[in-house]
Every structure is written in C-alpha cells, then in structure tokens.
From Swiss-Prot:
It holds the Pfam family Aminotran_4. Substrate binds at residues 32, 99, 101. GO terms for molecular function: D-alanine-2-oxoglutarate aminotransferase activity; pyridoxal phosphate binding. SUPFAM superfamilies: D-aminoacid aminotransferase-like PLP-dependent enzymes. One of its GO terms (cellular component) is cytosol. One of its GO terms (biological process) is carboxylic acid biosynthetic process. Keywords: Aminotransferase, Pyridoxal phosphate, Transferase. Its cofactor is pyridoxal 5'-phosphate. It comes from the Bacteria. This is D-alanine aminotransferase. The modification N6-(pyridoxal phosphate)lysine is found at residue 146.
Length: 282
C-alpha cells in the first residue's frame, strides 16, 4: 500500500485529500522540491531543503520545520514505500482559506504534502544524448523561487514534446536562460558557460554539483550570459536537473551540436557526477 505524507500524517494514497479551497489549487500559492534517491539514499537532500526553506521565506510562508525534520520526514516516506531508486516530491501551500488574492487573515496552517516515485536512471539518454528546441521564455520574473506556478514551463515542455524534443531551451530576447525543467550549459574551447544566478533562473542543485565537479576537475566554469547563436555554435551542450542528471544535448532545433556526438567534457562531468552520488547521498 503506497503511503503519502499530508497534513502531518502518513496515510494511504487513496486517503490523501486536500480542500478545494487550498491556495495551492486555486492560486498555485506554494513551493516544492524534488529529491533523488539512489540505492535507498537521499542525494544532496540538505541542499534541496535549504532551497525549499528559502523559497518559503521568499513568499512569506512560515513552515515551522527544520531541515533535519524535513530530512527525517522524506527518509521515513522513502522507507514506507520501499523506494530504492526514484524520487520524492514535496510541496507546501499557504493552506485552505476562502478564495481571496491576499494572504489569509489570520494566517491558516500550511499544507505540506509529499509522495514518492520509483524509477531507474535514464541510462540510454545519458549515453547517447537527447534533442532540444529553443523557445522564448514567457515565465514570470521570480524564477529563482521554486514555485508551484509552472504554466510557462508546462507550455514550453509541451512545445518540445510536439516536436519530439526532450527539452525546450528558453531565451529572453537573445539570451539563453534555462530549460523548461533544467539548467543549460554551453561548452566552448574547454570552458563551461551557464547563465548567472539571478531572478531569471532557478539555481539548480545539480547545477551546483556540476560547478563543484568543474572545480575538482579544474575545468573553467563561467557564470555569464550567452546568446542562442553562441549556444548553437558550442562544442558541447548539456542540461542538468535532479531527474536528468548531466544530460548531453546532441541536436538543437534540428541541427547537430558539432558532430552530434557526446563530447569529452560532458563525459568527464558525468563521471564526476557518479562520484558525487556516492559522496553526497545519506
């Protein structure tokens, strides 16, 4: 029987219910995180929950949980559902209250919910690479908050699916920001380029891991803006996320990235990622 955490309890999946007035449902008023499990251990879980609590603070949401309590919560859920390889989705909303755009007065209790999913790693895609398309970034101006407001991302991802691509790489004007559900990197002349951390992108946890790996491997890592043209002229292109890991992009908008093969620096980062799974899972 699959268990779900909701409102402070671990309940059977069919008993996991929220109010129709929940502000996450009617406004998207909430935040979330997705954490990867490898061999029954949680990967970079502390970093995920640091970001979770930062997102909560940015939207004025007091969760009354410590990082340690959140880690124990998802660890128990992982064990309850016998998840060895997979992920844990956790979200928090501002709670249930009569529909009104302003925050409830007085505040109501936030609703925290979490569930698990078992799945294997995307071995074939990591080995061979995937295709991407580019599209205008139509999202709001606080992409640094991991908010439930994902309609812009959903539309971009559906656009990618329509053209048989794995990811939609978004750009504001000529400047590449990030993927619909990933960070984006252009590798040129031995240097890794990615958009700087600001309100236009989410500071991905896997992005941070890639930066750590680059430092360990002495690969230059530059956080600076680059154009779609620069992206398409890169020697290698990758995307990263909790689910996609270090994913090679071998074709963009129907054109090969160089010879259409996975590059040497990408392979170096993938190998480094394997080591980080071992050293940063608890």
């Amino acid at each position: 029987m699959t268990k779900v955490f909701i409102n402070g309890e671990f309940v059977n999946e069919e008993d996991a219910k929220v109010s129709y007035e929940d502000r996450g449902y009617v406004f998207g008023d909430g935040i979330y995180e997705y954490i990867r499990a490898y061999d029954g251990k949680l990967f970079t879980v502390k970093e995920h929950f640091e970001r979770f609590l930062r997102s909560a603070e940015e939207i004025g949401l007091d969760l009354n949980y410590t990082i340690e309590e959140l880690i124990e919560l998802v660890r128990r859920l992982l064990k309850e559902n016998n998840v060895v390889n997979g992920g844990i989705y956790i979200q928090a909303t501002r709670g249930a209250a009569p529909r009104n755009h302003s925050f409830p007065t007085p505040p109501v209790k936030p609703v925290i919910m979490a569930f698990t999913k078992s799945y294997d790693r995307p071995y074939e895609e990591l080995e061979q690479g995937v295709y991407a398309i580019t599209t205008e970034d139509i999202r709001w101006l606080r992409c640094d908050i991991k908010s439930l407001n994902l309609l812009g991302n959903v539309l971009a991802k559906e656009y990618a699916v329509k053209y048989n691509a794995a990811e939609a790489i978004q750009h504001r004007g000529d400047i590449v920001t990030e993927g619909a559900s990933s960070n984006v990197y252009a590798i040129k002349d031995g240097v890794i380029y990615t958009h700087p951390v600001n309100n236009f992108i989410l500071n991905g946890i896997t992005r941070r891991v890639i930066k750590w790996i680059a430092e360990d491997e002495q690969i230059p890592f530059k956080e600076e803006k680059f154009t779609v043209e620069f992206l398409k002229s890169a020697d290698e292109v990758i995307i990263s996320s909790t689910s996609a890991e270090v994913m090679p992009i071998t074709k963009i908008d129907g054109e090969n990235v160089q010879d259409g093969q996975v590059g040497t620096i990408t392979r170096q980062l993938q190998q480094g990622f394997e080591k980080y799974i071992q050293s940063h899972s608890i």
